[in-house]
C-alpha cells in the first residue's frame, strides 16, 4: 500500500503540470488580456461581449496612479486594440506591471516555481493577495458543499434502499420518474425556477434572494443566527442537490440490488435470518462500499463544479463567483491560483477516495489490482 500511495503522489506532478500547461496555453490565445482591460477603460472602448458583464473592477487599478501616464499621441501604434491614442511608454509600463514584458515560457516557469512555494501573488485589480481572497470566499463555498453533500446522502441512501427492497413496485416506478425528471433539469434552471416561485419572483416571497446571512446578522441572538443562516442556504442547497440526489439514489439502489441477488444472501435467509438481519447485517456493508467511498469525490464535485452558477445566481460571494468574475476581468493570478488549488485538492481527494475503499473493505488490494 505504501508503494501505491507513493506512486499516486508522484503521478500528481505530471497531472498538475499538464493542467496548468493547458490552461496557460489557452489563456495565451484568448482575446482581451488585463492590459486590454485597462486600455479599454481608459479609452472608453469595448473589449468584447463580456465587458458589460465584468463590472468596474478595473477601476481599482486605475486609482493606483497609472492612469496619469495615459497621455495621448497621434502617431502611437500598438499591438493592443484601442491603444493607438495612448503613450507607448504607458503601454510598456502596463506590460511590465502585469509581467507581460517577459516571454511566455519564462512566465510559465516562474508561475510554476511560485506555485510550488504556494506564492500566488496579488490580484491584478483588487490589490489583495490571492490567498487572502481565497480565505475570504472559502466559507461560503464550504457551506454550500458540506450541507449539499450531507443532504444528498441523508435522503438518497434511505430512499435508494427502499427502492431496492421494493424493486418493480409502484413506489419504485413513480420515485424513479421523479428522480429522472429532476436529473434532467439543469441546476441553474432549477435555481431560477426556485427564485421565481419562492424568492419574490412572481408567487411567494418566503426566502431571501441573495447573500449568505442578513445584514443585521451580527445583532441577532445566537439561535436566530442559525435560523437565518439556513434560511439563506435553503434555495441554493436544493438547487445544487437536485442532480446529485438523483445520481446517489440510483447508485444506492443498484448497489443493493446487486448484493441482494448474490448467493450469500440466499444462504443467510436459508439459515433463518430475518429480512432486516440480512439487510443490515450482511448486505448493507457490502452495498455501501461504493457509496461511502465516493463521499470525498462527491463533496469535491459539489464544492468546485456545482457552486459556480449557483453562487452567481444567488449572489453568494464564494469561490465560484470569484472565479467567474476573475475570468471575465482577465485577473490571471486569481484564475490560475484557484485552478491550481482546486486541481490539487481534487487529485488529493481522489487518492483519499481510493484509500477509503481499502479501509471499508480490506479485501481490496491496489498493489495486485485484485479484490
Predicted regions and their residues:
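Internal alpha-helical transmembrane segments
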Residues: 1-29
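Cytoplasmic juxtamembrane interface segments
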Residues: 3, 47, 62-85, 158-182, ...
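Hydrophobic alpha-helical segments of integral membrane proteins
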Residues: 5, 9, 90, 94-120, ...
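Hydrophobic alpha-helical transmembrane segments of membrane transport/permease proteins
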Residues: 18-103, 202-225
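Alpha-helical transmembrane segments of integral membrane proteins
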Residues: 2-3, 138-139, 143, 147-171, ...
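Membrane-water interface segments at the C-terminal ends of transmembrane alpha-helices
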Residues: 23-29, 92, 179-211, 232, ...
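Residue-level signal for discrete positions within transmembrane alpha-helices
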Residues: 12, 137, 141, 177-180, ...
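An internal, D/E-rich "acidic patch" concept
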Residues: 69-74, 82-85, 89-157
Amino acid at each position: 500500500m505504501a508503494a501505491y500511495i507513493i506512486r499516486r503522489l508522484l503521478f500528481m506532478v505530471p497531472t498538475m503540470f499538464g493542467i496548468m500547461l493547458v490552461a496557460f496555453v489557452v489563456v495565451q490565445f484568448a482575446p482581451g488580456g488585463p492590459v486590454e482591460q485597462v486600455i479599454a477603460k481608459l479609452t472608453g472602448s469595448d473589449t468584447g461581449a463580456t465587458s458589460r458583464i465584468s463590472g468596474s473592477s478595473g477601476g481599482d487599478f486605475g486609482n493606483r496612479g497609472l492612469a496619469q501616464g495615459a497621455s495621448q499621441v497621434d502617431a502611437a501604434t500598438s499591438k493592443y486594440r484601442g491603444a493607438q491614442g495612448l503613450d507607448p511608454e504607458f503601454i510598456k509600463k502596463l506590460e511590465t506591471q502585469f509581467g507581460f514584458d517577459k516571454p511566455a515560457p519564462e512566465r510559465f516557469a516562474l508561475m510554476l516555481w511560485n506555485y510550488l512555494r504556494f506564492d500566488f501573488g496579488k490580484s491584478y485589480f483588487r490589490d489583495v493577495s490571492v490567498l487572502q481572497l481565497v480565505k475570504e470566499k472559502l466559507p461560503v463555498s464550504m457551506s454550500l458543499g458540506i450541507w449539499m453533500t450531507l443532504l444528498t446522502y441523508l435522503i438518497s441512501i434511505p430512499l435508494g434502499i427502499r427502492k431496492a427492497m421494493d424493486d418493480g413496485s409502484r413506489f419504485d416506478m413513480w420515485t424513479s420518474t421523479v428522480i429522472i425528471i429532476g436529473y434532467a433539469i439543469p441546476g441553474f434552471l432549477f435555481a431560477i425556477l426556485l427564485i421565481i416561485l419562492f424568492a419574490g419572483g412572481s408567487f411567494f416571497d418566503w426566502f431571501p434572494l441573495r447573500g449568505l446571512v442578513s445584514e443585521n446578522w451580527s445583532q441577532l441572538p445566537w439561535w436566530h443566527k442559525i435560523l437565518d443562516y439556513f434560511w439563506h442556504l435553503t434555495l441554493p442547497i436544493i438547487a445544487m442537490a437536485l442532480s446529485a440526489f438523483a445520481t446517489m439514489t440510483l447508485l444506492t439502489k443498484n448497489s443493493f440490488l446487486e448484493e441482494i441477488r448474490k448467493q450469500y444472501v440466499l444462504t443467510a435467509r436459508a439459515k433463518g435470518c430475518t429480512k432486516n438481519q440480512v439487510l443490515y447485517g450482511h448486505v448493507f456493508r457490502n452495498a455501501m462500499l461504493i457509496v461511502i467511498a465516493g463521499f470525498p469525490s462527491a463533496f469535491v464535485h459539489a464544492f468546485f463544479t456545482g457552486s459556480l452558477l449557483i453562487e452567481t445566481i444567488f449572489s453568494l460571494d464564494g469561490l465560484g463567483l470569484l472565479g467567474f468574475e476573475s475570468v471575465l476581468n482577465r485577473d490571471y493570478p486569481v484564475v490560475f491560483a484557484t485552478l491550481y488549488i482546486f486541481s490539487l485538492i481534487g487529485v488529493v481527494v481522489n487518492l483519499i477516495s481510493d484509500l477509503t475503499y481499502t479501509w471499508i473493505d480490506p479485501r481490496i488490494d491496489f498493489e495486485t489490482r485484485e479484490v
